[in-house]
């Protein structure tokens, strides 16, 4: 929540927001300024970003974690289907880059295999239950490098009016 609105809304530690936040967000401010935004989410469920992890069964690792995506919690996005639909699969980023149709603000969220702290679930296809913290960090570094290369290698990057801001929640 902090990255999308400069506030934490009571989300201390690993807790998710309380479900609905009725305060301004970065996405809402961009829309008011006539700018576009999109959230590119790795392993997002086909049914959307609803307030759950995905997949929702007990036999599969939950790779998409809504707690890493602030937008489903924001009332002004929840209440506007057009804005809510701007949460898309990460794979769409590459098509958008190739067609030069990227938004003014792109928020990219890796799944729980590539977020630098991984999953302890042996069902997770992250590299096995014997993963170490070092492997989690390496996987996150590799994912970040791969994404930066894709972005900076695209025609969109060539105009020079771009920036990449990468954040990591866990100390490295």
Q: What residue ranges belong to the model's regions?
A:
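N-terminal pro-sequences and low-complexity stem/linker regions of secreted or lumenal proteins
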Residues: 1-172
């Amino acid at each position: 929540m902090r990255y999308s609105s400069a506030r934490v809304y009571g989300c201390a530690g690993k807790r998710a927001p309380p479900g609905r936040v009725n305060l301004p967000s970065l996405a809402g401010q961009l829309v008011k300024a006539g700018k576009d935004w999109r959230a590119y989410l790795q392993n997002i469920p086909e049914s959307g970003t609803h307030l759950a992890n995905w997949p929702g069964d007990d036999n599969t690792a939950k790779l998409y974690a809504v707690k890493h995506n602030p937008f489903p919690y924001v009332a002004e996005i929840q209440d506007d289907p057009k804005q809510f639909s701007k949460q898309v699969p990460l794979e769409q980023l590459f098509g958008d880059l190739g067609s030069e149709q990227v938004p003014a603000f792109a928020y990219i969220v890796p799944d729980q295999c590539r977020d630098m702290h991984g999953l302890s679930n042996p069902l997770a296809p992250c590299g096995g239950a014997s993963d170490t913290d070092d492997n989690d960090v390496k996987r996150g570094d590799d994912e970040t490098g791969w994404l930066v290369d894709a972005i900076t290698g695209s025609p969109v990057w060539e105009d020079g009016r771009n920036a990449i801001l990468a954040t990591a929640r866990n100390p490295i």
